[in-house]
């Protein structure tokens, strides 16, 4: 199988469908996705030839946005930190794991500051 960086790949992540370039998925070569889409890990496809990933489908959009932009981009009021953290661990994306930890720590500090201010 020829692997090209500009290949557009179709994904089935927990029943949610995504399209992206191979280069996006291999941006972090030591990650699970990097290994999977560089041919180092076996992969399965569904009946529509979409790569099957047994992850949280809705949360994968945040992982994919990180892979595309190298930034943690989340909607205002985002509350699903535990799920996102679990998914980042599952995909073994160390930079994303660190950004999530940093963001969660900032939220904790902000909440503590608000509690202190309220007294």
Segments (PLM) and residue ranges:
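Intrinsically disordered, low-complexity regulatory segments in eukaryotic proteins
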Residues: 101-119
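Intrinsically disordered, low-complexity sequence elements enriched in Ser/Thr/Gly/Pro
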Residues: 20, 48, 111-115
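Canonical BTB/POZ domain core
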Residues: 2-12, 17, 23-99, 103-105
